[in-house]
């Protein structure tokens, strides 16, 4: 197993100057790249890492030349936010990364210097990032056999002039949020097939709906309407679902079977309740926090989905 790399082919094109310049939004944000709860992530540390990458990593230099470095800089901030959330989760869940396993992961990625270039961090942060990867996998493994959600919803497809599938899905989501007691009736409109069931995280793995396992569906509070696109690569199909309940079973059950990448993604999703509880604020020069995607987005138009609090949820 190697450290999960950061460089991705699909990036948005905005100038590097936007990343390296810009204005803060006030005294509480001006010297911070992000604020997680009461903890500030120093802006100068993020800028220092950006400068190191531009000076030492050819892939980062290529992105800068293509004017595509903005999305990469948001990934830097995202990883630091995730680290802060993970510190809270690890303390609550009693998780620890074995130092020997951390070393092995780094060595399997070519050592500290090569790993730094692979994942896009300064060498002195490689060990922290490797430990975070292991902890996220542990967190995912811990919740796979225990977590389930009770949902009612439907899949929205098809577009019409002036109305995309996302538009229609969002409109349905807002209707459900306004009258959650009518959710089954509302989702059945237009001949849609109603999804009204309890989804167990462990049962989704290996199924045709495996993509849902790491989705926002399992990270929101009960009484939230989730509007997401589970498989963007498979066409414009949007899931609209009211999460009526979220249950975490007792410990001691057999751990779920999943590959390390899937466990990592599920672990990341399990940080969503902590992010919601603590609050995450991003310096506007980098964008805004996307709770649906557990990432930093350029603006709300780039959110991975929509999370709408329902007005009431009747038992």
Locate the predicted segments by residue:
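Secretory-pathway/luminal and periplasmic proteins that interact with or process carbohydrate-rich
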Residues: 111-116, 193-199
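Sec-dependent N-terminal signal peptides
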Residues: 5-16
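Short, well-ordered alpha-helical segments enriched in acidic and aromatic residues
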Residues: 183-193
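PPIase-associated folding chaperone regions across multiple families
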Residues: 116-175, 188, 208-315
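C-terminal motif of bacterial Sec signal peptides marking the signal peptidase cleavage site
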Residues: 19-22
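Short helix-loop boundary/capping segments
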Residues: 196-209, 213
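N-terminal targeting/tethering segments
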Residues: 24-121
